[in-house]
């Protein structure tokens, strides 16, 4: 059995939580939602399964914090990309598309969001939603400052982007079985990657936008 030494400082607590989250990430990317268990996490960390309960009540809370980590990185990338250069509609869509393609794992995790939220304590959900609100406020402020667009058009853009959050990964990562079934059923399907899908859809969502500069 691993010896457990309780973290005594905020920094130590944060380090332990990050170690748990990183182990969860490795397990999830290799085996999906069902593969993530406290037992599996303990096998990849420096402490035992029971000690994980000192930091998280459920595996979903670990996954919720992993999604928060992904989302913060994604948002930082969006802000960094849009902080300089021209503000044309094309570049706006391209930056979001390129940053999103660099964070595909976030969109994979979004496919399990309902399960994750159902199994998480509300404080973990609130922490994630706070960053989500930050994104909404930032992107709305950017659109207001740089584009002539009606309120309806801006709302349509946000709604479309939310759909991409949940649907882009499954659409761009069909299994061999899914692809074979589509072909056998005669369903037209043109394989694409996440960046291309994002850019194509975002250009449609912003078709009525006009640059102020």
Residue ranges: model-predicted function:
Residues 1-15:
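N-terminal intrinsically disordered/low-complexity leader segments
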Residues 141, 145, 149, 167-213:
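C-terminal peripheral helix-coil segments that are non-catalytic and often amphipathic
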């Amino acid at each position: 059995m691993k010896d457990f030494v309780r973290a005594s400082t905020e920094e130590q607590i944060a380090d332990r939580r990050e170690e748990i989250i990183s182990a969860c990430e490795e397990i999830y990317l290799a085996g999906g939602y069902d593969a993530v268990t406290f037992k599996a996490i303990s096998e990849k960390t420096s402490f035992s399964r029971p000690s994980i309960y000192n930091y998280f009540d459920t595996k979903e809370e670990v996954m919720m914090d992993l999604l928060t980590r992904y989302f913060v990185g994604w948002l930082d990338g969006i802000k960094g990309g849009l902080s300089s250069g021209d503000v044309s509609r094309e570049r706006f869509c391209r930056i979001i598309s390129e940053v999103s393609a660099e964070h595909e794992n976030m969109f994979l995790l979004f496919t399990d969001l309902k399960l994750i939220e159902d199994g998480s304590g509300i404080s973990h959900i609130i922490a994630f939603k706070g960053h989500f609100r930050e994104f909404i406020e930032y992107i709305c402020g950017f659109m207001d400052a740089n584009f002539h667009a009606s309120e309806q058009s801006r709302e349509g853009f946000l709604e479309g982007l939310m759909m991409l959050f949940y649907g882009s990964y499954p659409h761009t990562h069909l299994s061999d079985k899914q692809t074979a079934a589509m072909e056998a059923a005669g369903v037209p399907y043109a394989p694409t990657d996440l960046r291309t899908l994002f850019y194509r859809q975002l250009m449609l969502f912003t078709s009525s936008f006009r640059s102020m500069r």
